[in-house]
Amino acid sequence: MAEPWKVAKFGGNCVSRPDMYDRIAKVLTTDPLRKFVVVSAIAGVTDSLVTTVVKPREEKEIDLLIGELRRKHLSLLPKSRGNHDTAVETLDALTTKLERLLYGVAYTEEITPRTKDFVLSFGERMSAQVVAANLRERGVDAVPHEADVIGVMTDDNYGNATALFDETRSRLAPFLERQADAGHSSVITGFFGMSQEGKTATFGRGGSDYSAAVVAYALQLPTIEIWKDVGGFMSADPKIVPEAFSLSALSYDEAAELSYFGAKVLHPRAVQPARAGNASLVLKNIFEPSEVGTRIGPDTVDKTGDVKSISFVRDLATLKVFASGAGSKESLLSEAATALSDAGINVYSAATSQTCIAFLVDSSAVGHAKNVLGRVPSDVLDRIEVLPHASLICFVGEGLGYAHGIAARVFRAVAEKGVNVQLISAGASMVAYTFTVETKDLEPAVRAVHREFFAHRYGAVASGHASVAPHSAT
């Protein structure tokens, strides 16, 4: 039986410089099974588009943006006429369409979620053209494809859509299999698909990892490679803990928890389609392709109860909702959490007592969150207090929920550094515990927890790494 094909996803920094295309081509030609390539937008492009649609712009600003996007993408094209001219024609058509779209937004001074998603999709659309042209220049028979055209189907939740797995499989798989059988390498846009209404819907920022896993699910492939300009997961952020070391394997749940709570090497939603397809996610460093990286899959579960990694999220705030008998008012927690969710506010953690419900949210959203909670109908609501300058620390490992004494070791190590723990959360997941500290205490707390569990390895850890993963949100 022939070996199965693979999906290889390349992040924004991997497609942002001309010299990177030599590396991408080498990755693909070294292993011809890497037939399906999923790409992010070139680094910085989506940020520029987001800035543009947050507030309608004047025509002069739109002209400057379109000019800059065109120059950036054209500067990355190969020089040979055939590959260059074909890509230029398509890029011109894309930038013209984007320009007209932004003029329309400026004229009406409003933008719907559907229109916003369509605008944001242009980063990946342009990137796919540039990547495919460069791969053809280097001998790879690459053909660019737009995900919403070839069959990546989603629900109608614009801005944070979810792929419809079975519908995507029935539409996407036959098309891509024909492309591969014909010898083509498909370069597919990440980040978006087509909604049930026939409109472009995005998966949220960083959603190209998720796209790659969806493509693998549709094709029933066992391996999704996530190529970035950094390594895989580490035991902690090496910027804070110099002794941090690389992790060769994680379970699905461990990877999802670490990604959600600050480790930015993988989008947390990428785990869902990988798990559904029983596939492995392999995080690879494009600068060190021979390194093992981190494998996440069905065969990497280690339930020893050991702590595997520590991640964190900065710049949070705790909202404390005081209410008489809060703990016995079952509907109050539900109503408050639903109100925050409906307002698009991410809640990292929640805890309740007899007199108070506490929510952990981004500090940038705390004012909005306070207003939202203030409108929750309740005859028992007393007051709302804000505790600013909070950071969340998460420690992860399969089987932690069954291990004895792990939490005690963590909090003892933190207390010995004079750090006060504010909000503790355990039990929602059997693989992760979280707690909050004041932001000024974050770094010493992370170092203390890491030393508590990994001090025995410090003598064996090299003084430096060829590359390090940015393990946390900054």
Which role fits each region the language model picked out?
Residues 290-474:
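A conserved regulatory-domain signal marking ACT and ACT-like small-molecule sensing domains
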Residues 1-266, 271, 362, 436-438, ...:
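Nucleotide/pyrophosphate-binding catalytic subdomain
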Residues 33, 140, 279, 345, ...:
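Short phosphate-binding/catalytic loops that engage adenosine nucleotides
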Residues 223-225, 280-283, 288:
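Internal nucleotide-binding/catalytic subdomain
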Residues 149-151, 288, 428:
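Residue-level detector of flexible, active-site-proximal loop/helix-junction positions
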Residues 104-105, 111, 116, 241, ...:
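Residue-level detector of functional hotspots within protein domains
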